[in-house]
UniProtKB/Swiss-Prot annotation:
UniProt subunit comment: Part of the 50S ribosomal subunit.
BP GO terms, sorted: cytoplasmic translation
GO molecular function, one term: structural constituent of ribosome
This protein's GO CC annotations: cytosolic large ribosomal subunit
UniProt gene name: rplF
Biological role stated in the UniProt entry: This protein binds to the 23S rRNA, and is important in its secondary structure. It is located near the subunit interface in the base of the L7/L12 stalk, and near the tRNA binding site of the peptidyltransferase center.
Designated name of the protein: Large ribosomal subunit protein uL6
Length: 177
């Protein structure tokens, strides 16, 4: 069995899990998420714990059991606490403003960028150079953060661009004559 799959997923109070065939749904205070469980993975509910096992001893099925356990754990954390990613804008005149489901970005181009946020993701701008992306789906929050960062990645000479709050930008020295 996968080392990851050996650990059970503990369900906190207020989180409901329903298993109908291969469809697993998780409901919590912040919302609900669904997952199609792979046919080679068996999900066992014991009280307030979920255990995962491969249906046969095949190496690929063991790995899939660990992957499914990690996905379900992220779903449980998402519906109970939620996920957030923080981005910083570094550069003169770089600004961000959240208006509903649209994020307006001024990143030094000749035109402003209007980024339409997908359903299930909310963006906040505590100030003009910070963006907070929040949601219950870890993959979607990370995807949105990566797409916003891709508009203007941090460049290595001055460090200007959109970066994750915890990101360390590798700097280069300018050419000398």
């Amino acid at each position: 069995m996968s080392r990851v799959a050996k650990n059970p997923v503990v369900l906190p109070a207020g989180v409901e899990v329903k298993l109908a065939g291969q469809q697993l749904s998780v409901k919590g205070a912040k919302g609900a998420l669904e997952l199609n469980v792979h046919s080679s993975v068996e999900v066992i509910q014991e009280g307030s714990e979920l255990r995962f096992a491969a249906r046969n001893g095949d190496q690929q099925n063991k790995a899939m059991a660990g992957t499914t356990r990690a996905l379900v754990n992220n779903m449980v954390i998402g519906v109970s606490q939620g996920f957030e990613r923080k981005l910083q804008l570094v550069g003169v005149g770089y600004k961000a403003q959240a208006k509903g489901q649209v994020l307006n970005l001024a990143l030094g181009f000749s035109h402003p960028i209007d980024y339409e946020l997908p359903a299930g993701v909310v963006a906040e701008t505590p100030n003009q150079t910070e963006i907070l992306i929040k949601g219950i789906d870890k993959q979607l929050v990370g995807q949105v953060a990566a797409e916003i960062r891709d508009f203007r990645r941090p460049e290595p000479y001055k460090g200007k661009g959109v970066r994750y709050a915890d990101e360390v930008v590798r700097r280069k020295e300018a050419k000398k004559k």
